[in-house]
UniProtKB/Swiss-Prot annotation:
NCBIfam families: DNA_YbaB_EbfC. Binds to DNA and alters its conformation. May be involved in regulation of gene expression, nucleoid organization and DNA protection. This is Nucleoid-associated protein NIS_0256. The keyword Nucleotidyltransferase does not apply. Keywords: Cytoplasm, DNA-binding.
Length: 103
C-alpha cells in the first residue's frame, strides 16, 4: 500500500486524513436524528454528537409511568443507535482507496 510513496507523500496523506476527519466531525455535529416509540407517542431527537436535544411525550402517557419509562428508554436507545451507525458509515466512507494513492 505504501511501497510507492515517499515520506513527503505520506505526510500529505495524513494531512488529508485530518482534513477529512475535521470535515466529517463538522458534518456529524450538524445532523439530527429522530426515533419514535409507542406509535409516535414518544419522540426523541439527538444531534450527531449523540446528545439528546429534544423529547416529546404525548399527554396520554403522563398517567402511566411504567409505559412512559419503557417507551422513553426504547426511543432513546433507538436514536443513539442511529447516531452510532451513522458515525460508523461516515468514518468508513472517509477511508476511500484514493487516500492512499490506490484507485
Amino acid at each position: 500500500m505504501f511501497d510507492k510513496m515517499n515520506l513527503g507523500d505520506l505526510g500529505k496523506v495524513f494531512e488529508e486524513i485530518q482534513e477529512r476527519a475535521k470535515k466529517l466531525q463538522e458534518e456529524q455535529e450538524s445532523k439530527s436524528f429522530i426515533a419514535k416509540s409507542g406509535g409516535g407517542l414518544i419522540k426523541v431527537t439527538a444531534n450527531g454528537k449523540g446528545e439528546i436535544i429534544d423529547i416529546e411525550i404525548d399527554d396520554s402517557l403522563l398517567e402511566d409511568k411504567d409505559s412512559l419509562q419503557i417507551l422513553l428508554i426504547s426511543a432513546i436507545n433507538d436514536v443513539l443507535k442511529m447516531v452510532e451507525e451513522d458515525k460508523q458509515r461516515s468514518a468508513l466512507s472517509m477511508m476511500t482507496p484514493d487516500i492512499f494513492g490506490q484507485k
